[in-house]
Amino acid sequence: MSVIDLPEFFYKAILLLIESGVILGSLGVVLFTNIVYSAFLLGWVPVCISFLYILLNADFVAAVQILIYVGTINVLIVFAVMLINKPQYFRFLKYWTVGDGTALALCTSPFLSIIAAILSTPWSKISLIVLSNKIVEEPLTDNVQRIGFHSLTDSPLPFELLSIILLVAPVGAITMARREEAVEAEESEALKTKDDFPF
């Protein structure tokens, strides 16, 4: 039984939870001053959006949503952790400026317009597009279709290993760069000590 076959009450409850997760995650991204917390919440938003695709019986789109966006945000988290040297102090709200108020005003109007459009749209009259089995049984003539099909069916392990290698490579490069900076800092401190005590 698919999610769409659930009773309408459960469907609305699940949809409300997903929308709440998207809104709260988006607010956390812009309100948290710690970049690591913001990056984690930025990864939570595409996950909630993928749940919306699952409600629409678009499983493949939901999986691609998680693989692409959440994977990219994980790389962002790694870069944030490795490149930020100064200590991060937790503070939920920062001091508001004129630019913050202007940005809030510019973002609120389209946000309210989208909410009005969502509420005024007759969603119950929109028919769901269900893919038939004929599309799956058709021969794969496109190279992209062949690569995607064999990568996710015949050889998923090399596909995942490739993604891990692409993640490990920048992490290793950043680690080596930071290690060289630490060695240079220790050498400069040693030279200062020799200058202070020439005897």
UniProtKB/Swiss-Prot annotation:
<keyword id="KW-0472">Membrane</keyword>
<keyword id="KW-0521">NADP</keyword>
<dbReference type="GO" id="GO:0008137">
    <property type="term" value="F:NADH dehydrogenase (ubiquinone) activity"/>
</dbReference>
<keyword id="KW-0150">Chloroplast</keyword>
<keyword id="KW-0520">NAD</keyword>
<comment type="similarity">
    <text>Belongs to the complex I subunit 6 family.</text>
</comment>
<feature type="transmembrane region" description="Helical">
    <location>
        <begin position="35"/>
        <end position="55"/>
    </location>
</feature>
<feature type="transmembrane region" description="Helical">
    <location>
        <begin position="157"/>
        <end position="177"/>
    </location>
</feature>
<keyword id="KW-0934">Plastid</keyword>
<keyword id="KW-1278">Translocase</keyword>
<keyword id="KW-1133">Transmembrane helix</keyword>
<keyword id="KW-0618">Plastoquinone</keyword>
<dbReference type="GO" id="GO:0009535">
    <property type="term" value="C:chloroplast thylakoid membrane"/>
</dbReference>
<dbReference type="GO" id="GO:0048038">
    <property type="term" value="F:quinone binding"/>
</dbReference>
<comment type="function">
    <text>NDH shuttles electrons from NAD(P)H:plastoquinone, via FMN and iron-sulfur (Fe-S) centers, to quinones in the photosynthetic chain and possibly in a chloroplast respiratory chain. The immediate electron acceptor for the enzyme in this species is believed to be plastoquinone. Couples the redox reaction to proton translocation, and thus conserves the redox energy in a proton gradient.</text>
</comment>
<keyword id="KW-0793">Thylakoid</keyword>
<feature type="transmembrane region" description="Helical">
    <location>
        <begin position="64"/>
        <end position="84"/>
    </location>
</feature>
<protein>
    <recommendedName>
        <fullName>NAD(P)H-quinone oxidoreductase subunit 6, chloroplastic</fullName>
        <ecNumber>7.1.1.-</ecNumber>
    </recommendedName>
</protein>
<comment type="subunit">
    <text>NDH is composed of at least 16 different subunits, 5 of which are encoded in the nucleus.</text>
</comment>
<feature type="transmembrane region" description="Helical">
    <location>
        <begin position="96"/>
        <end position="118"/>
    </location>
</feature>
<keyword id="KW-0812">Transmembrane</keyword>
<keyword id="KW-0874">Quinone</keyword>
<feature type="transmembrane region" description="Helical">
    <location>
        <begin position="13"/>
        <end position="33"/>
    </location>
</feature>
<dbReference type="InterPro" id="IPR042106">
    <property type="entry name" value="Nuo/plastoQ_OxRdtase_6_NuoJ"/>
</dbReference>
<dbReference type="InterPro" id="IPR001457">
    <property type="entry name" value="NADH_UbQ/plastoQ_OxRdtase_su6"/>
</dbReference>
<dbReference type="Pfam" id="PF00499">
    <property type="entry name" value="Oxidored_q3"/>
</dbReference>
<dbReference type="InterPro" id="IPR050290">
    <property type="entry name" value="NAD(P)H-Q_Oxidoreduct_6"/>
</dbReference>
<keyword id="KW-0813">Transport</keyword>
